[in-house]
Structure formats: structure tokens, C-alpha cells
């Protein structure tokens, strides 16, 4: 083959690497809506015009959408395309039966056998390992939670079924998170409540928005958003099923109807707060006792047969007889204990399973694993022996997730709540006091409990310690600074400016130091030695000497600084004089260079032909006109400024 033909062939191949959207739609026989869905499910996005090399841009236009040939091949081998075609056929049949033939029985059968496409194989292709899927849960969770708060509207493309499934999946995830004690960080912002959990050693962050009245804007394409959410629903279902299985939990969890009617979200799946809890426990105990009785009866029958054979020996040795009876009783008790502990077997194995999976993925044990386990155990029992009463005005969902994941207990204003407001075991009460309105009917001092604001729980979780409640009381208007815990994470540095964070941290440290000093003074006053006066005098003398030394050092440092500043000023003056001289010299050189350049141009003009001289003159005139217009414009601006 000739070289020119070979070059043309290579050029055609490289130009054929990029295909237009119109070309792909013709090849696949799809609508724009179906093609958009398919691209969202497969994670294929269009290429920018600038990504195409300059050599091959002649054939393409800026306003068109382009995809690569590899993207086209991925889409062409997809199973869902056949499902889309089947759906079209069934829709035609349904319209024909209902509208033209008016055969309603046949139309019902068509609806019952309507084809449905599944996305499980696509999720397995995109995320072959479960940890990869957990990495990409951030967007999925925040989108699903936001979509669950929208009102259903078929005109805009917000489907009622999808809204309900989003609510259900949100509750399933929150139930799993607080039941397995996974929450690590939380933050209150203008957008909503940021929460972070650690699942399979991967950080998952999501937003729970504030309660608001939704406003549907016509500029937003909700049909496109619903396509994304259809994919996110499939992904979250897949991940939740696997996570529940790892922790020996049933999926989907059973929901209590009474708690569901009161709209308690994730708590409706919790057995600890269900109304039928006592009945369930009684039935479980009866079943376990029946199993244990069967086992004990079998063991007793075998023991009786053995004892008949060994009666003669026992008559001779009475000690052996007593020991055999005691062993039989011990075995029966041991069986009953094992039956009672069958409930909690799954809970004890969860941490070991996760630890083994992480080791299998990495192939070795990290030295920081022990630190992570200690932190996890610390957060697990952060609010242990604490009972919080949450008022109706507070964000119940967020506070309940954090408190329950940290080992605390909850009560609220309802007949279903396990702990009522009158109970003396309640340690804290969460609400915000307004100036104009009285929040509580009962006075504060009626019950011995601490009245705090909701920021206290967020700050305790971020600090991983129980903070003093005196700074977060409902009476106080100026609360301590609420710092963002995501400043250390690379993905979430943009949430808070670093300068603000450092300033707030400095302020917070000063407040803590002052509190610590006050606390130490109080302790010293309580535990004073008999010779405390002499010790105080010695301490005061030491402080005075230290202060004198510090003052001397400060004065010496100031004097050195002043001397350096004077030296710098003198150097600057010298530099200015040198610069002025240099500028004068440069200006002289510039004028000389310009003159020499003009002389050279005139010499070249003499050598040029007549045509080129005229062309050069035109260029020169055009440049002069441009300069004149610019000068006029600048003069006008200066006049306006002077006025």
C-alpha cells in the first residue's frame, strides 16, 4: 500500500473514534429518553469538544454531543435495550386493547405481565467489590433523602412509588447505622445536618436537609433527576442487603404498625421501641424453654440408664454418687444458659466478620487497627447511662440517630415512648428557649435534670468526650463556636474556610484553658495542705521572677526589632536612589534604540518595491488612526473623572 493511502486510512480510523449522539441513536434504535437512561445506568458521559484533537476537529461541530467508539460498544451489548423494546411493544398492545377494542380483561392481563428491567448486573459490573460501592454512597444517600421530602407530581416527573421507596431506604440505612454504632462525625450547617459513618473502613457522608416547604421550580428537569434516583435506589438496596447479611441482621427489617402511624421513621423498625415487644419476648422464651426441655429430657433418660448399671459401684463409693448427680445438674443448667444466649450470638460476631473481611482485602494487619477499635468502643459507650428527652421542635431524626449510636436512650412526647416525661431517670432535656414564648408548661426546677441545647450532642460526638453542660444551657444565648470536623478530610475541605477554622480553634482553646484554671483553683482551695501559706508565698515569688525575666526578654526583642527596622529603612532609601539612576539610564537607552530602529526601517523602505511601499504606508496609517482613537477615548475618561 502506498504511504498516502495508508495515512488516509489511519486518519479515517482516528476520526471514527468519536461518534455523534444522532449516529448512535440511529444504530441502536432508541429514543433520547431511553438513551439518557442507559447512559446514566452505565456511567457513560459525553465528551467535550476540546478533548478532540485539533487535527480531527474539522468534521465536528461545537454544538453537537460526542461519544467515543468504546462507549458505543459498551451500550450496544447491553441487555436492557431488549427490555426497552419489549416495553414499547406491550404499550402498543395495551393501547390497542383498551382504546380501540375496549377489551378490559385482556388489558389487565397485559398490565400484570408487563416487562420490568433490572439493574443488578450493571451494579456488579461497575462495583465488583462491596467496598467500591460503599465509596460511592455519598451522592446516592444525599439524593435519596432529598427526593423523599418532595411531593409527588406526575407532571414534573416525581413519581409517588419512588418517593415511598426513598423514604423506606432512608429509614433502613439510618436503622443499620445506629444499630451497629457506625456514626463518627456530625455538623450543623445552613444546608442541613451532615453525618459521617465508617462502613468497612470507608467514610460515608450524607446530608439530612432541614424541614422545609418544597417549591417545584419549572427550570429544573425532575425527569432527569428521577432517572438518577432509579439507579441510586438499586445501588442502595444492593449494598444494604450485603451489609445486613454481614452483621447477621434480617433484610428488609420488620416494621411496627403503631410506630409507623406516628411517623417515627427508623425507630419503627427497632424492636426495643415496638409496642408488641413484651409479647414477642414471651413467645421467644416459651420456644427456647421447650427446646431446652427436650434436650434435658433426652439427657436425663441417658443418665438414668447409666446410673442403673453403676448402682453397685455407687453403694460402695458414696462420694462418686454425689459427684455424678452434681454433674448432671450442671449440664442441665449449662444447656439452659446456652439457649438463653442464642439471641446475642449474632451481635458478638459482627465485629470479627468485618475485621476478617478487611484483613482479607488488604492481605495484612495495619498497626492503626487497635487505635480504631479503641475509638469505636469509646464512641459506642459515649452516652451510656444517659437518657435524653427530645421536644417536638427539635430535629428528632438526627438527634435520635446520634444518641442511639453512642449508647444513649431516648424519650419523647408520645404514649408509645418507653420513658415518659415524669420519669426521674431522665438526665437531660433537649430544647431551645425563645424570648417571647415559654417552651415548657412545667418549671425547670421541678425535675432534677439538665436543660441543654441540641448543639451539645454534636460537639460531644466530634470531640469524642462528654463536654461540660454549663456552656450549652438553654438560658445562654452565646454558645461556643461550632467547628466543622470535616476540615481534615480531603473531600470536604471546601465546607469551611481554613482561616475561620484556625481562628475559631484558637478561641476555643483559650476558653478551655480558662475553664481548666478555674477548676484547678477550686480543687486547690478544697485540698489545701497545712503549710499552704508558705507554699503560696514561694509560688508567688517564682511567678514574679519569671515575669521579670519575660519582661526583660521582651524589651530586648523590641530593641533588636527597632534596630533592624532602621537598617531596613536606610537600605530602602539607598535602593530608591539606585533605581532612579537606573530608570534614567534605561529611558535614554530606549530613545536611542527607537531612533536606530526608525533609521533601519527607512533604509529597508528604499530597497522595497513600489507595491510593498504602498502596503507598508497603509499599515502605518492604520496604526496611527488606532492610536488617535485610543488617545481621544482616554482624554474623555480623564475629563469625566476630573468633573
Curated annotation (Swiss-Prot):
Its main location: nucleus. Residues 305-329 are annotated as: Disordered. It comes from the Eukaryota. GO terms for molecular function: ribonucleoprotein complex binding; RNA binding. Residues 305-323 have a biased composition (Basic and acidic residues). Residues 531-615 form a coiled coil. Residues 378-474 form the BRCT domain. The keyword rRNA processing applies. GO terms for biological process: maturation of 5.8S rRNA from tricistronic rRNA transcript (SSU-rRNA, 5.8S rRNA, LSU-rRNA); maturation of LSU-rRNA from tricistronic rRNA transcript (SSU-rRNA, 5.8S rRNA, LSU-rRNA); regulation of cell cycle. The keyword Cell wall biogenesis/degradation does not apply. SUPFAM superfamilies: BRCT domain. InterPro entries: BRCT_dom (IPR001357), BRCT_dom_sf (IPR036420), PES (IPR010613). Keywords: Coiled coil, Nucleus, Ribosome biogenesis, rRNA processing. It is found in: Nucleus; Nucleus, Nucleolus; Nucleus, Nucleoplasm. One of its GO terms (cellular component) is nucleoplasm. Belongs to the pescadillo family. Required for maturation of ribosomal RNAs and formation of the large ribosomal subunit. Interacts with dual specificity protein phosphatase YVH1. This is Pescadillo homolog. It comes from Plasmodium falciparum (isolate 3D7).
